[in-house]
Regions:
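N-terminal membrane-targeting hydrophobic helices
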Residues: 1-214
């Protein structure tokens, strides 16, 4: 899952209005933000296998430290503790968002999501069908966008256009990821992931800066 995680990040603004959208996105996508660094370091492995599933050409060979249920619970507690003073609900919301990544990925992934490092792997395999994946992910994303729009108000043109450009831009990025060719190399995967997520975090911070919680 990709864009559905951002949907939860958007929606979480209602529960923790004092937390920047960038931090909520970081929490919801913490697993995928950490993963490219671990791939670059050789700690986790991925293989390019066109046709591996209908949705992605990537075969996630091993990612126990970024994507296992146990480790995401640990990362969630640590990240929530780091931002606990930002908002009275920050700890609980951020920790839950980090852990939610595993729950959502289990729905879409084939059985490659570890329960703990070295443990059994699970997955319901929705990625075997592009239409079914879209039927789950897109409503989740649009619901999150709608909740964020109702929970905040734009301050001037920047507030309105920043938010619009963010949610439309993420949607277009999702479409490009699905329709585009497989990545040319493992290096392209982790480098693109690092740069891409950094850009999204900066973009979401800027857009949210001109919104007021209501």
């Amino acid at each position: 899952m990709f864009i559905g995680h951002f949907g939860l990040g958007f929606a979480a603004k209602r529960a923790a209005p004092g937390v920047s959208l960038a931090i909520l996105f970081l929490a919801a996508q913490f697993a995928d933000t950490l993963w490219p660094f671990l791939v670059a370091a050789g700690v986790e492995q991925v293989r390019i296998d066109p046709g591996h599933t209908a949705v992605t050409p990537l075969d996630f060979v091993s990612y126990p430290w970024s994507h296992s249920l146990l480790m995401l619970a640990v990362w969630g507690v640590l990240l929530g503790w780091m931002f606990r003073t930002v908002d009275r609900r920050a700890f609980a919301v951020i920790a839950a968002l980090v852990l939610s990544h595993w729950v959502l990925d289990v729905v879409t992934h084939i059985p490659d999501m570890p329960l703990y490092p070295g443990g059994p792997r699970v997955g319901l395999g929705l990625w075997r069908s592009m239409p079914l994946t879209a039927a789950v992910e897109l409503p989740l994303y649009f619901a999150g966008v709608w909740i964020y729009a109702r929970a905040t108000r734009g301050r001037g043109t920047k507030g309105r256009l920043g938010f619009a450009s963010l949610w439309i831009g993420l949607l277009l990025l999702h479409v490009v990821n699905l329709a585009g060719p497989p990545p040319p190399s493992i290096t392209a995967i982790w480098a693109g992931g690092i740069v891409g997520f950094a850009a999204i975090m900066a973009w979401s911070w800027w857009a949210d800066r001109y919104r007021t919680a209501i």
